[in-house]
From Swiss-Prot:
Highest taxon of the lineage: Bacteria
Signal peptide stretch: none
Family membership: Belongs to the RNase HII family.
Keyword Nuclease: yes
Binding site for a divalent metal cation: 24-25, 116
Function: Endonuclease that specifically degrades the RNA of RNA-DNA hybrids.
Organism ancestry: Bacteria, Pseudomonadati, Pseudomonadota, Gammaproteobacteria, Alteromonadales
UniProt name for this protein: Ribonuclease HII
GO biological process, one term: DNA replication, removal of RNA primer
Disulfide bonds: none
Primary enzyme class: hydrolase
Source organism: Shewanella woodyi (strain ATCC 51908 / MS32)
Catalytic activity: Endonucleolytic cleavage to 5'-phosphomonoester
GO MF terms, alphabetically ordered: manganese ion binding; RNA binding; RNA-DNA hybrid ribonuclease activity
Database matches in Pfam families: RNase_HII
Amino acid sequence: MAVFKGITPEQIESLSSGLHAGVDEVGRGPLVGNVVTAAVILDPNNPITGLNDSKKLTEKKRELLFAEIHEKALCINVGHATPDEIDELNILHATMLAMQRAVAGLDIKPLSVLVDGNRTPAFYHGEETEDRIEAHAVVKGDGLISAISAASIIAKVIRDREMDLLDMEYPQYGFAKHKGYPTKAHFEALELHGVLPEHRKSFRPVKERLAKR
């Protein structure tokens, strides 16, 4: 595993060209819902301007780029890990599993996988579990590597939409506003309305609420 802490412009250019899959996750911190990952292979001949870490973009800009990425990217796939898997494996290992699912489901086998952060799981393409794909962890890669930026945008928009749907089902929890993160409003809703099947039972605030039954 390579960790590019002081990545050079030359490395960025090299890793941003060719059929490299960028991978990022959204949703490790929330108390509810899936952790969502995305794998994106961009078309070097059809660049997208304005890509950046999804957290640094407005919702409107993310939605516009989400559509453009789907229009121009060579390949996109999304992976999930459920609340039950998060509770069983822990959030780190569940996130790694979701990343593996995102890469395994790509229609194109990438030359390598570039993951935002400081660690990466083993990646394989489809059912070819003997054919391991080279992978690199890139610290702050969502602001450095276009494919990782694209993956962060895809994962963020998908998860936000999932929270909007959950909000329609349980409007009293305010998921459309706080997206499941541990905010004061979420704590108050937990206390007042209780734990939902979609909550992560291993996370402390949820576990403490369950203990009050």
